[in-house]
Amino acid sequence: MNDTLLTLILIVIKLGLVLGTVLTLAAYMVLAERKILGRMQMRYGPNRVGWGGMLQPLADLIKLLCKEDLIPQRADRWVFMLAPAISTITALLAFAVIPFGAPLQLFDRSLPMVICDLNIGLLYLFALSSLAVYGVALGGWASHSKYALLGGLRAMAQMISYELAMGLAIVPVVMTARSFSLTAIVEAQQSLPNMLRHPLAFFIFLVAIMAESKRTPFDMPEAENELVAGFHTEYSGMRFGMFFVGEYLNLIVLGSMLTVLFLGGWYGPLLPGICWFLIKVLGVAFFFIWVRGTMPRLRYDQLMAFGWKILVPLGLLNILVTAAWLIWRG
Amino acid sequence: MSLWKDIKGTILPFWVTLRYLFRRPVTVCYPERKQTPAPRYRGRLVLTRDPDGEERCVACHLCSAACPVDCISMQAAEREDGRRYAAWFRINFSRCIFCGLCTEACPTLALQMTSEYELATRELLQVIYEKDELLIDGCGKNAEYNFYRRAGIGVVAPRGANPGESSPEDVKSNLP
Ligand code: SF4
Ligand code: SF4
């Protein structure tokens, strides 16, 4: 009884810590993105609120909370109100299975540095990222606006297509680790990160998660020039904010996924595991921002063609080759 | 070969953006560092006086006719000696687009543009300038020009007495 209670308390503490860290991280990711993009374009970026702009996320939050929250007259009220929540919650839920570090020894018991070490963690992650499509698609549909509908449709098509490539890219990883548990996958990379073992899978996965996060160069759903703002055109106030934060949460989730699956998770010399994990996730996030500052938007047909005609066949081929190699090695 | 070009064209921009990340921004941080506008900068409008210290504006309405956004209004009045002036003169700077067409239209050089650009305020009524706020003490960009000295017929000098003018013809004298 006492033991169960202790486990429960520990889980709640871990939950609170993870939630707090991730939400703060997402807020500051927005700031970091604006600052880095600014520097790449030889401007400063936000630097007025607080020390060098450090309180900007707070100011944004206050602004979003004070804004009028509009619901279009002929929108489907309930779906319209639920859609942003779906986007944010699916992203938050994903953190339940992501391992941040090696198990810790505390009170004579092993404390896993993951909220819940599911043995099908990877499938859980994929299920959630499929659900995330609903937030976008329903948001676009419920707004009763052509722009939002088109944006939602595009987002749906794009996310589903690239999810396929993403799924194919991780099959070799699962095959070498012989497990769906994320902790096991990280432990299998102790000597050599999967990035070097499966470079092709790494490339496919990287491109796929970029498309999945709906960011430049894959920001079709939002394409401001053609679609006003895509699926969240009709959203305002905190509802828009939830979509917005959802995007950055998603960025952290995908960065963590990339870290866990390909960059060797918490393994690294000198520093404690959790630091390495954070460094890797932030590195991936920086890379994403860098790409956004560099690449122009793709054309929609090119995007689809690239997904279906190049990434998916490559992914399949990669599985075959890996399987053959594994069998040959015995 | 074209594939190689494509790959190079994809990779190279990353290097460019990374280099720019470490350059100094060119942004001028405004309230701390103010820039001096060029002499012909089109900032806030003023009404100037002629070298004698009298108001130049003759309330001819040409400026308000030229203004594309209709933000100038005035009422004409006449002094004892026949000299025209504006009883009131109003410019609504919340509508002004600082195009300078009014100053082009002004025949007396009364209306001129300055390089003042800090007009922002939270009170909308504060950017509606009345005549006493517009009228300055100097001549502005042209210190010599005096409209009434040239054409202020019967006000400053009798007919034909202005510099460069010949006295009027007596139309009765050249009858056949
Ligand atoms: S500058 Fe242009 S807009 Fe402004 S008062 Fe003159 S004519 Fe009108
Ligand atoms: S400012 Fe110039 S154009 Fe306008 S009424 Fe006065 S004299 Fe005429």
From Swiss-Prot, chain A:
Highest taxon of the lineage: Bacteria
One term of GO molecular function: oxidoreductase activity, acting on NAD(P)H, quinone or similar compound as acceptor
Bilayer-spanning residue ranges:
5-25, 78-98, 120-140, 155-175, 191-211, 243-263, 271-291, 308-328
Q: Name one GO cellular component term.
A: plasma membrane
The membrane topology term of the UniProt record is: Multi-pass membrane protein
> Which InterPro entries does the annotation name?
NADH_UbQ_OxRdtase_su1/FPO, NADH_UbQ_OxRdtase_su1_CS
Q: Which Enzyme Commission number(s) are on file for it?
A: 7.1.1.-
Q: Which Pfam families match?
A: NADHdh (PF00146)
Cellular location of this protein? Answer: Cell inner membrane
- Please name the GO terms of the biological process aspect recorded for this protein, alphabetically: aerobic respiration
Catalysed conversion reaction: a quinone + NADH + 5 H(+)(in) = a quinol + NAD(+) + 4 H(+)(out)
Cited function: NDH-1 shuttles electrons from NADH, via FMN and iron-sulfur (Fe-S) centers, to quinones in the respiratory chain. The immediate electron acceptor for the enzyme in this species is believed to be ubiquinone. Couples the redox reaction to proton translocation (for every two electrons transferred, four hydrogen ions are translocated across the cytoplasmic membrane), and thus conserves the redox energy in a proton gradient. This subunit may bind ubiquinone.
The record's note on quaternary structure and interaction partners says:
NDH-1 is composed of 14 different subunits. Subunits NuoA, H, J, K, L, M, N constitute the membrane sector of the complex.
**Record's protein name:** NADH-quinone oxidoreductase subunit H
Which species is this record about?
Answer: Syntrophotalea carbinolica (strain DSM 2380 / NBRC 103641 / GraBd1) (Pelobacter carbinolicus)
From Swiss-Prot, chain B:
Q: Where in the cell is it found?
A: Cell inner membrane
- Any GO CC annotation of this UniProt entry: plasma membrane
Q: Which reaction does it catalyse?
A: a quinone + NADH + 5 H(+)(in) = a quinol + NAD(+) + 4 H(+)(out)
Keyword Cell inner membrane (UniProt): yes
Which InterPro entries does the record match to this protein? Answer: 4Fe4S_Fe-S-bd, 4Fe4S_Fe_S_CS, NADH_quinone_OxRdtase_chainI
Cofactor names from the entry are: [4Fe-4S] cluster
**Which ranges carry the 4Fe-4S ferredoxin-type domain?**
47-77, 87-116
Binding-site residues for [4Fe-4S] cluster 2, renumbered to this chain: C67, C96, C99, C102
Q: Name one GO biological process term.
A: aerobic respiration
Stored Pfam families:
Fer4_7 (PF12838)
Membrane topology field: Peripheral membrane protein
Per UniProt, [4Fe-4S] cluster 1 binds at C57, C60, C63, C106
Q: Which UniProt keywords apply?
A: 4Fe-4S, Cell inner membrane, Cell membrane, Iron, Iron-sulfur, Membrane, Metal-binding, NAD, Quinone, Repeat, Translocase, Ubiquinone
Q: What is its EC number?
A: 7.1.1.-
**What Gene3D superfamilies does its record include?**
3.30.70.3270
Free-text remark on how the cofactor is bound:
Binds 2 [4Fe-4S] clusters per subunit.
UniProt GO molecular function: 4 iron, 4 sulfur cluster binding; iron ion binding; NADH:ubiquinone reductase (non-electrogenic) activity; quinone binding
Q: Which family does it belong to?
A: Belongs to the complex I 23 kDa subunit family.
PANTHER family (alphabetical): NADH DEHYDROGENASE [UBIQUINONE] IRON-SULFUR PROTEIN 8, MITOCHONDRIAL (PTHR10849:SF20), NADH DEHYDROGENASE UBIQUINONE IRON-SULFUR PROTEIN 8, MITOCHONDRIAL (PTHR10849)
Q: What is the role of this chain?
A: NDH-1 shuttles electrons from NADH, via FMN and iron-sulfur (Fe-S) centers, to quinones in the respiratory chain. The immediate electron acceptor for the enzyme in this species is believed to be ubiquinone. Couples the redox reaction to proton translocation (for every two electrons transferred, four hydrogen ions are translocated across the cytoplasmic membrane), and thus conserves the redox energy in a proton gradient.
Q: Which HAMAP family match?
A: NDH1_NuoI
Q: How does it assemble?
A: NDH-1 is composed of 14 different subunits. Subunits NuoA, H, J, K, L, M, N constitute the membrane sector of the complex.
Name of the protein in question: NADH-quinone oxidoreductase subunit I
Q: Please name the gene that encodes this protein.
A: nuoI
